């Protein structure tokens, strides 16, 4: 089966933005104008096509990135048909993982800003993520009909706060309630969209007289930006003072793809103005799969290889999202980088080193699907029937194995205990958690050995709220949720020698176990070491493992506050036994008693987990952020300058002091700072804190 759309007419783009910039509404308009949906779905009605989870329709925010395929011939039908694969992504800080994994598989992005609130904190986070993956992007300044909307101010913020060279290719005609349309700064014409047919038709008109001078000035800036693409263009521009429309477009396209400039458009998706012009700009300026560098990977001999966007190259794809569908089971969203994959054929998962079979391949339109016979280089689709694939795995041709660049996922930062409300919920909960963890790499599940509770960890409180909500709705599991917890540890600080003796002799067969142990502290992270120095058979060899086992059991239960003991070396150097009464159980108990007695004499200490915290904040709030970290017993490790005038603060802070930090940081910096944290080490807890914890658990 031949390719229906040539690869140079593909655009794989993401629509990314801050919460509430109007991103999902923009996507809805795109689907309406490209003919995919006949009725526009509004977010505030809970009817948006791409928000298909119940939680999203209730909360009015986008949680998972839905992939949608659509076609576009241009506002004026000026193009041959182009195929646009769009990924709509969430803008909430707890879901940055979704944005990250979408950007990883896209070739370009449309970043939506609100015309009145401009560059917001989450926009800074998203922008940095796009910088990390070098994604070419353009800007749509939306909500120009809103009170306080100001296109020039937003363009200025993009330049100063995000450090981008922003080049407007449109300017607005009026703003707020007076917003009428836009001026195309390349054609130098005004565009008015009809209000009778939801903006389906439009007309080109002359630029209003009062805006002519400003439009001429902005046109000049745009032509200069285009001329900088090459020496030839610059020479022509200096000689003639102008460039042709085609030359301008080709030059701006090249500079956008090279990440040198960011083009800006404006409009109001809700008022049906400007969205088709965004689609035209996507086709004109954002890259096709063949315009971006070929993806790199590692072959089975650990050599670096490339996979070009070519149907004739060996098949290679990246699984970038797993979703559970109520009708077909597990959907694995894949981005095909090279080659062709037919439904029903076999693939090799090079990360898991397993062969898999693809049952069916479907093209997703938010929540609906069309069956496909095959997918080719540049396609984004969902595969059904893959058994053991997780986000970030590479699927490839068995004869040409490759592992594509892995995605890096942040460590979860918050943990809560969940308990099923009834026995019936117990089994369902295990299945639900396993499925949810397969879908979301930033969500973890484990069992606490001390309390046997199920612990779930994620990227924030909203993240875990939604997980618990999904367990209830999708899997029918009712559960109780505990408070966030910290996991402490214990260790010793000095060396002791101690006797452990267990004797029971009351007529008949007794119990006798007798050991001498030396306990020594080890360096941080060294774990547990057991050494047998018994000579001359004072303890028979078959009882030695029982002593070790008894010590390890006592270590798990701790000696101060029932937390596990870390970093200890125990040497068994003497002891005695009884011909009749000694057995394994007696020596196990003797080992356990000896360790407990010795650890209490060896200057025991309570350890608390300390986190490596990195805060990104605008310079204005640096003093407040540092002061707050100091109040949380944080040690400031250093500070750096980030892109776009932000400061990076590196600190080490005890986990116990970090609960509620996301909320506090948001309010202290008006939501403009973001942070990440990961586990660093266990350190001695201060005496007053250790004392309170030990008393609360005794």
From Swiss-Prot:
SMART domains from the UniProt entry: EFG_C (SM00838), EFG_IV (SM00889)
Domain of life: Bacteria
Compartments, record wording: Cytoplasm
Keyword annotations: Cytoplasm, Elongation factor, GTP-binding, Nucleotide-binding, Protein biosynthesis
PROSITE patterns: G_TR_1 (PS00301), G_TR_2 (PS51722)
Molecular functions (GO terms): GTP binding; GTPase activity; guanosine tetraphosphate binding; translation elongation factor activity
One annotated GO biological process: ribosome disassembly
Pfam families for the chain: EFG_C (PF00679), EFG_III (PF14492), EFG_IV (PF03764), GTP_EFTU (PF00009), GTP_EFTU_D2 (PF03144)
Residues engaged in binding GTP: 17-24, 88-92, 142-145
Principal place of residence: cytoplasm
Keyword Methyltransferase: no
GO cellular component, as recorded: cytoplasm
UniProt domain tr-type G: residue ranges: 8-290
NCBIfam families: EF-G, PRK12740.1-5, small_GTP
Family designation: Belongs to the TRAFAC class translation factor GTPase superfamily. Classic translation factor GTPase family. EF-G/EF-2 subfamily.
Function: Catalyzes the GTP-dependent ribosomal translocation step during translation elongation. During this step, the ribosome changes from the pre-translocational (PRE) to the post-translocational (POST) state as the newly formed A-site-bound peptidyl-tRNA and P-site-bound deacylated tRNA move to the P and E sites, respectively. Catalyzes the coordinated movement of the two tRNA molecules, the mRNA and conformational changes in the ribosome.
Name by which UniProt lists this protein: Elongation factor G 1
UniProt organism field: Shewanella denitrificans (strain OS217 / ATCC BAA-1090 / DSM 15013)
């Amino acid at each position: 089966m031949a390719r229906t759309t040539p690869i140079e007419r593909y655009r794989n783009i993401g629509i990314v933005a801050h919460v509430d910039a109007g991103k999902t509404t923009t996507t809805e308009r795109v689907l309406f104008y490209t003919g995919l949906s006949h009725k526009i779905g509004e977010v505030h009605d809970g009817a948006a096509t791409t928000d298909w989870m119940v939680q999203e329709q209730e909360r009015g925010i986008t949680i998972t990135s839905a992939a949608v395929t659509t076609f576009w011939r241009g506002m004026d039908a000026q193009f041959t048909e182009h195929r646009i694969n769009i990924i709509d992504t969430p803008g909430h800080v707890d879901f940055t993982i979704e944005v990250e994994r979408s950007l990883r598989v896209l070739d370009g992005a449309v970043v939506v800003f609100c015309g009145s609130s401009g560059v917001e904190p989450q926009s800074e986070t998203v922008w940095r993520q796009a910088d990390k993956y070098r994604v070419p992007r353009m800007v749509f300044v939306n909500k120009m009909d809103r009170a306080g909307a100001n296109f020039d101010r937003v363009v200025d913020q993009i330049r100063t706060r995000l450090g981008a060279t922003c080049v407007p290719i449109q300017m607005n005609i009026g703003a707020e309630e007076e917003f009428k349309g836009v001026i195309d700064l390349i054609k130098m014409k005004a565009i008015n969209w009809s209000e009778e047919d939801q903006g389906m038709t439009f007309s080109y008109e002359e630029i209003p007289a009062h805006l002519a001078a400003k439009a001429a000035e902005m046109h000049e800036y745009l032509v200069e930006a285009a001329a900088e693409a090459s020496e030839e263009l610059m020479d022509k521009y200096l000689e003639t003072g102008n460039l042709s429309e085609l030359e301008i477009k080709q030059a701006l396209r090249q500079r956008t793809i090279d990440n040198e400039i960011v083009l800006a458009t404006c409009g109001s998706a809700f008022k049906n103005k400007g969205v088709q012009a965004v689609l035209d700009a996507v086709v004109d300026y954002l890259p096709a799969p063949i315009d971006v560098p070929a993806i790199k990977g590692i072959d089975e001999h650990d050599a670096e290889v490339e996979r070009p966007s070519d149907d004739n190259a060996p098949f290679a794809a990246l699984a970038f999202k797993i979703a559970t569908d109520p009708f077909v089971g597990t959907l694995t969203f894949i981005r095909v980088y090279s080659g062709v994959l037919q439904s029903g054929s076999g693939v090799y998962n090079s990360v898991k080193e397993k062969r898999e079979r693809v049952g069916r391949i479907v093209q997703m339109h938010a929540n609906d699907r069309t069956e496909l016979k095959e997918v080719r280089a540049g396609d984004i689709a969902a595969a059904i029937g893959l058994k053991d694939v997780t986000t970030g795995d590479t699927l490839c041709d068995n004869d040409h194995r490759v592992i594509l660049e892995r995605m890096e996922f942040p460590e979860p930062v918050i943990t809560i205990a969940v308990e099923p409300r009834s026995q019936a919920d117990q089994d369902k909960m295990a299945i639900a958690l396993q499925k949810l963890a397969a879908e979301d790499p930033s969500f973890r599940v484990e069992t606490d050995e001390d309390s046997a509770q199920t612990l779930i960890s994620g990227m924030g409180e909203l993240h875990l709220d939604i997980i618990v909500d999904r367990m209830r709705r999708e899997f029918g599991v009712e559960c109780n949720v505990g408070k966030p917890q910290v996991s402490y540890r214990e260790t010793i600080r000095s060396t002791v020698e101690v006797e452990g003796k267990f004797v029971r002799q009351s007529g008949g067969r007794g119990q006798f176990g007798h050991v001498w142990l030396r306990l020594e502290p080890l360096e941080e992270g060294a774990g547990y070491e057991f050494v047998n120095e018994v000579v001359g058979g004072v303890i028979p060899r078959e009882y030695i493992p029982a002593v070790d086992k008894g010590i390890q059991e006592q270590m798990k239960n701790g000696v101060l506050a029932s937390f596990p003991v870390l970093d200890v070396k125990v040497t068994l150097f003497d002891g005695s036994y009884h011909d009749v009464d000694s057995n394994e159980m007696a020596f196990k108990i003797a080992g356990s008693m000896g360790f407990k007695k010795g650890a209490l004499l060896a200057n025991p200490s309570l350890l608390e987990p300390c986190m490596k915290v990195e805060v990104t904040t605008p310079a204005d709030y640096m003093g407040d952020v540092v002061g707050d970290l100091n109040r949380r017993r944080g040690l400031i490790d250093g500070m750096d300058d980030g892109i776009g005038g932000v400061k990076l603060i590196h600190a080490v802070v005890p986990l116990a002091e970090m609960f509620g930090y996301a909320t506090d940081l948001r309010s202290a910096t008006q939501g403009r700072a973001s942070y990440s944290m990961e586990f660093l080490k266990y350190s001695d807890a201060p005496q007053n804190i250790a004392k309170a914890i030990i008393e609360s658990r005794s």
